[in-house]
Amino acid sequence: MLSILMQGLRLKKCFLPILVMFFLAGCVNLLGSSFTASLKNDANASSDFYIRKIEQTQNQQDLQTYKLLAARVLVTENKIPQAEAYLAELIDLNDEQKLDKSLIEAHISAVKGKNETAEYQLSLIHLTSLSPSQKSRYYEIVSRIAENRHDNISAIKARIQMDNFLSDIQRKQQNNDRTWALLRNTDSEVLNNTDAEGNITLSGWLTLAQLYNDNLNQPAQLIQTLLTWKNYYPTHTAAHLLPTELQGLANFQQTTLTQVGLILPLSGNTRLIGETIKNGFDDAKVNYNVQVHVFDSMKMSIEQIINQAKKQGINTLVGPLLKQNVDVIVNNPYLVQDLNVLALNSTPNARAIEHLCYYGLSPEDEAESAASKMWNDTVRIPLVLVPQNNLGRRTAAAFTLRWQQLLGTDANIKFYNQTADINFALKSGLSESTDGVYIIANNKQLAEIKAVLDNINPTLKLYASSRSNSPNSGPEHRLFLNNLQFSDIPFFKDRESEQYKKIEKMTNNDYSLMHLYAMGYDAWLLINQFNEFRQIPGFTIDGLTGKLSAGPNCNVERDMTWFQYQNGSIYPLNEQDDSIYLINEE
């Protein structure tokens, strides 16, 4: 009897671990492994890290979790097809994994602009079932949907909700930066008319944006206003983590000029170009008591000029103009250490260098302006017709980049070598759905192109660059170009001004020289507010060549003026009073 009992106990000892193992296995299938719970937390690694884990992991549940983490991060890296591929591989998910998958799918829909689908997917998710990290992702998707609909205020409100569930400082900073970007891109009138409805955080953001916009061109006042705001909203998220764009204002010092070095080619074949720019620069600074030292870059090397300027105690330089000299500085930034430099050109090698900005009349500015203008005019399938040369390639690249930002697709680009190629380029590039054409051509070529387009589709919206604007355009030519729009510098808006008539006479009505004069004029405006321009986000200068602002690497960006041929005359379009009469010569 005793032996039988002992055998029974031995059997229990043998089977008990097995039973426990099966029980635990059942719990894992039902509840998921402890690693699955990591889906409730932030995914802080790169997609490459999670993809490597997928390749190394044998456990099926953990493998599914790593695929979800990889897909989540791939969406934030804008690698949507890869994310979708990992989601498609998932099988036999537990409840925690299904929940996280639904969040990722909603995020993908929002990124793709499928707003209704994303909203429906979110409606199936119960907020109470989400962890704080997952709730922050939920509201990020809500914000993205609102952004897709150009409803910045709703996007900001969602970002405020998102902030409540963020614990990581870096993520909070990123969220504040994005909230601030939305505020900066919202029309001032919309901000002023938005009711915070008792939401103290929203009220703080709106007030911050309004104060910033109101004091943008008064830097000293702006800094004091920001300090006052922080005292009024001491517990606000932005008071603890000021948007990155605003953090540099604490060290801002107003521009003070005593001596300036102006570097231009003033002899040889480029003398006329250099002298015209200098004339504009001199006219702009006429009322300022600042000593200007002029250096001829055709007689001295750029290294010699910089060394000479330093010996003379000059710490601010305008120039050089020639690209090879700009490249010398770009490749040897130590040359201009401790100097403020406004280069009057840019090159493909241009990069961010402390206290250096690049300014020039580049075709990229016009191409980007054209893409934005066509988008605003509801053009969605444009054809871009450009010459097969450096100008054409630069224009095409800049237009395509801007179009991708606006619509997420490439623009249809067609090149031509000579006038005889234009007819073929147009017929091969146009489709029934094409609704606008951007043309880079001279005045004569433009007329020929328009004649072809009028025969193919007279309803197309036509746009051109300043290259086609010529003083030789008579009434008949202007009438033929009726309704065509083109970009140019705002200096051409008022031909009756004393300044215009003076420069018209000085340059013998040569438009290319008038552009250079305007560039020289604006070079003074820029260097005279150089610190403000570089350090205050959104700071703009209304110049003769456009509304000037600092872009990436401190490339000076120009907001162009658009004109239109109407019944033999030319009118500026982006003015409040479009009835301004510009040209009507008989």
From Swiss-Prot:
It is a lipid-anchor. It comes from the Bacteria. A lipid is attached at C27 (N-palmitoyl cysteine). GO terms for molecular function: enzyme regulator activity. A lipid is attached at C27 (S-diacylglycerol cysteine). One of its GO terms (biological process) is regulation of cell shape. Transmembrane segments: none annotated. Residues 1-26 form the signal peptide. Belongs to the LpoA family. Interacts with PBP1a. Keywords: Cell outer membrane, Cell shape, Lipoprotein, Membrane, Palmitate, Peptidoglycan synthesis, Signal. It holds the Pfam family LppC. The gene is lpoA. It is found in: Cell outer membrane. Regulator of peptidoglycan synthesis that is essential for the function of penicillin-binding protein 1A (PBP1a). This is Penicillin-binding protein activator LpoA. One of its GO terms (cellular component) is periplasmic side of cell outer membrane.
